[in-house]
């Protein structure tokens, strides 16, 4: 199977960039799915209770929902010590992921080992702001490792939350 990229030379900065951003997109999908599974398990188990009004769909609302559930629902408080730091890690990685995915490439090649993107932040009822975002080869190994860890740690937590809710009728 070949997924040739027209106009992109093998081994070029663009090929490296496309591979890195592609990895971020695919691995983030796997990692964030763990949040979706956790939210779905809780939502279906507790449906109808005051805390559970609407299933969250955006990352921030999922993180807020899960944090609140771990703090306020007795069956889930056992996950608070582990869950809250994990949710914080998701928030940090999610911002970087959003910057890369929703930013536009600003330079045709890496400069000083970094690809630069321009990101427009939309601020309702205010002026938009434009900022530079960098995908730096020195930061890449740690970010790649964090994305892999979020997938693993998130899936583990999702399974344990689901299993704990099966035990508590």
State where each predicted segment sits.
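Acidic, Ser/Thr/Gly/Pro-rich intrinsically disordered interaction regions
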Residues: 1-26, 30-169
